[in-house]
Structure formats: structure tokens, C-alpha cells
Amino acid sequence: MNLAKYIDHTLLKPEATMTQVDQIIAEAKTYQFASVCLNPYWVKRASEALQDSDVKVVTVIGFPLGATTTATKVFEAQAAIENGADELDMVINVGELKAGHDEQVLSDIQAVVKAGHAAQKHVKVIIETCLLSDVEKRRACELSEKAGADFVKTSTGFSTGGATVADVTLMRSVVGDRLGVKASGGIHSKEDAEAMIAAGANRLGASAGVKIMNSK
């Protein structure tokens, strides 16, 4: 198994410096990770640095709370695409999901998916599993699929918990082979990575990608 091709090499902390961003980009080239995942501010720099590479540029939309307006998310998505983003990881409106306002959740996702797909870019939907019941996780996955998303993703890594094998298993059971499943948050070792893949993840968001690749 080529673990590198599963990994979105991630640096989303707010205090990330240009030097650290450049290091992430260099590591992604060296290890041939699937992508780098960076905040929108760094997308243009990463896109220019990776233009002669197979490494994609992923960024985050409505991050990390998901509580911005749909119009703001769409603007953010379009700006990211203009700056060279290949994939968009958006956060759902968690509060509206928990309140049972599924139409609002659906239209929010659909708007970002429309913006992404208009430019042939993949959209992943972060459902923030640590804040949801299993019933809510299922609804979030169903709404993401209905909205036309390409992936469902467990976590931002900025809330109360990250990916679990149980959540990845549940999400895969809902979306079948129709959508991708991205596990993110708390994946620190090769064992963690392999467990998530075995549970059904076909992409991993991790800041520990180099450590994972170098572990025996």
C-alpha cells in the first residue's frame, strides 16, 4: 500500500508561517503526498510551487466553524479556485444540522459544490463528527451525497475530537462507494493511518505525514 497517496499533508494552524508552509510544500513533493492542505491565504503560493508536480492543493472553506453565510462560503470557494486550489474542504452548518433544518444544510453544501464543480474541482464536506450523534452523522452524509459532494470528511481538527474508526466505518456504510471518505484529526502514526483505511477511508488529513511515512 502506498500510504503517501492517501495523505493530504496538512498545515492549518493559524500561526503557520511562510517558512513552515514552504516546508510542507517541499515535504509533499519529496514524499509525493496526494496533496497539501492549507488555509486559503497560502493557496496561491502553494499552487505556484506545485505547478510542475502531481501534488494537489487543498484548502478549507467556512473553516473551522462552518457558521459563515452560504454567500461567504461561495465567495471563499471561488477565490480559492482563482488562486489555484484543486479541492475544497468545506464545513457544514453544524448548528442547522443539529436543529433539524436539513434544507438549509443541503442548500449550503449545494452552493459550494456548484462553485467547485463549475471549475471541475472536488468538494469534500466536513461534518464535524465529534459534535454529532450517530443519527446526525448519517443525515450529514446523506445530505452531502444529495448535494453532489465528492467526499465526506470527519473533522476539522479544531473541535473536541478527530477521526475515529467507528465514525469512518459509519460514514462509509452510508455513502457506499459513491463518495470518498476522508478521515482527519488525530492521525499520528502508521497504525492510525492503516486503521482508518481499513475502516473505509480513501483519504487521510494529517499533519504527521512525514512521521507516518518514516515509521516502520
Curated annotation (Swiss-Prot):
What's this protein's name?
Answer: Deoxyribose-phosphate aldolase
| Family annotation (SMART domains) | DeoC (SM01133)
Give one Pfam hit by family name. DeoC
Show the coiled coil region(s). Answer: none
Q: Which residues form the active site?
A: D89, K153, K182
EC number per UniProt = 4.1.2.4
Top EC group:
lyase
Q: What's a single GO BP term from this record? A: deoxyribonucleotide catabolic process
Q: Where in the cell does this protein reside?
A: Cytoplasm
- State the organism named in the record: Latilactobacillus sakei subsp. sakei (strain 23K) (Lactobacillus sakei subsp. sakei)
Which keywords accompany this UniProt record? Answer: Cytoplasm, Lyase, Schiff base
**What does the protein in this record do?**
Catalyzes a reversible aldol reaction between acetaldehyde and D-glyceraldehyde 3-phosphate to generate 2-deoxy-D-ribose 5-phosphate.
Write down the superkingdom of origin: Bacteria
Keyword Transmembrane (UniProt): no
Extract the InterPro entries matched here.
Answer: Aldolase_TIM (IPR013785), DeoC (IPR011343), DeoC/FbaB/LacD_aldolase (IPR002915), DeoC_typeI (IPR028581)
Family matches, as Gene3D superfamilies:
Aldolase class I (3.20.20.70)
Family to which this protein belongs: Belongs to the DeoC/FbaB aldolase family. DeoC type 1 subfamily.
Q: Name one GO cellular component term.
A: cytoplasm
Q: Which GO terms describe its molecular function?
A: deoxyribose-phosphate aldolase activity
Main location, first listed in the record:
cytoplasm
